[in-house]
Amino acid sequence: MYGIEYTTTLTFLILLVLLNYILKSITRIMDYILYTFLLFIVIVTPFVNSQNYGINLPITGSMDTNYQNVSNPEPFLTSTLCLYYPVEAETEIADSSWKDTLSQLFLTKGWPTGSVYLKSYTDIATFSINPQLYCDYNIVLMKYNANSELDMSELADLILNEWLCNPMDIALYYYQQSSESKQWISMGDSCTDKVCPLNTQTLRIGCLTTDTTTFEEVATAEKLVITDVVDGVNYKINVTTTTCTIRNCKKLGPRENVAVIQVGGSFILDITADPTTAPQTERMMRINWKKWWQVFYTVVDYVNQIIQTMSKRSRSLDSASFYYRI
């Protein structure tokens, strides 16, 4: 009887020692796995370019304030930049590899090769019909010309702002502008716009609705026309529809991914005087006219400062942007 009890006790002790050994072995294995994982994290962390949530987050002030977590000091590595310039720049530079040179110069400012696109245009009037603002950031170089000053001003107003536009059937309907932010935009190869104001009884004021030669002419053979008339008055409109389209538009606000640089001129064009421009700020600046290489050097040198005045857009813009809300 005592032999059976001794055997049972011995078996229990052996199982207890074996269980203790197994638990210690599992603990050592878990410690090894944990320390190996921590070592891997320590080694890999310097090479990971991820967001550090909670790092440098202020603990004072309003909790409603939005804070941006960015661990990458180069915000332009994933952005595209379009630089629009008059075709005469290529003629003056006369170097087949000048774009490659400019690309390398942009690289010194943090813009990778392939992220900057150089696009030429024939003249301001033609460019205004279809600007094609496709990049995240768009900078337009406009050489000052006293004869096209009004065209430059209208183009700047067009591309620096967003417009909500609808087609107009001027053959059937009268139209009026109910506020300062609502204007009519005409685009085409040749736009001649005429208007005939009407009173509350739809009777003409100083013109004959059946005779377009008596209409007041507000634009003659232009490619871009932004027409502003007296608010609250109906108008009969006449436009050369074969070469021009007209739309009823409302200025929504600034298009913040576009900037205009005026090249030359004694003063910079100012579109903020327009009461429809709100807020009263503009992304327009001037570079003294010298040579086109000097102009491009200046743009490259200050490109990042210029971009800081703009906001990146995640979608491309083209001519349809002026016709539909974006």
From Swiss-Prot:
GO terms for molecular function: metal ion binding. Glycans are attached at N69, N238. Residues 253-255 are annotated as: GPR motif. N-glycosylated. Keywords: Calcium, Capsid protein, Disulfide bond, Glycoprotein, Host endoplasmic reticulum, Host-virus interaction, Metal-binding, Outer capsid protein, Signal, T=13 icosahedral capsid protein, Virion. Residues 1-50 form the signal peptide. Ca(2+) 1 binds at D95, G206, T214, E216. Disulfide bonds join C82-C135, C165-C249, C191-C244, C196-C207. Residues 165-167 are annotated as: CNP motif. Ca(2+) 2 binds at Q177, D228, V229, D231, D301. Gene3D superfamilies: Glycoprotein VP7, domain 1, Rotavirus outer-layer protein VP7, domain 2. One of its GO terms (cellular component) is T=13 icosahedral viral capsid. It comes from the Viruses. It is found in: Virion; Host endoplasmic reticulum lumen. Some rotavirus strains are neuraminidase-sensitive and require sialic acid to attach to the cell surface. Some rotavirus strains are integrin-dependent. Some rotavirus strains depend on ganglioside for their entry into the host cell. Hsp70 also seems to be involved in the entry of some strains. Homotrimer; disulfide-linked. 2 Ca(2+) ions bound at each subunit interface in the trimer hold the trimer together. Interacts with the intermediate capsid protein VP6. Interacts with the outer capsid protein VP5*. Calcium-binding protein that interacts with rotavirus cell receptors once the initial attachment by VP4 has been achieved. Rotavirus attachment and entry into the host cell probably involves multiple sequential contacts between the outer capsid proteins VP4 and VP7, and the cell receptors. Following entry into the host cell, low intracellular or intravesicular Ca(2+) concentration probably causes the calcium-stabilized VP7 trimers to dissociate from the virion. This step is probably necessary for the membrane-disrupting entry step and the release of VP4, which is locked onto the virion by VP7. Belongs to the rotavirus VP7 family. This is Outer capsid glycoprotein VP7. It comes from Rotavirus A (strain RVA/Human/Indonesia/B37/XXXX/G8P[X]). The lineage of its organism: Viruses, Riboviria, Orthornavirae, Duplornaviricota, Resentoviricetes.
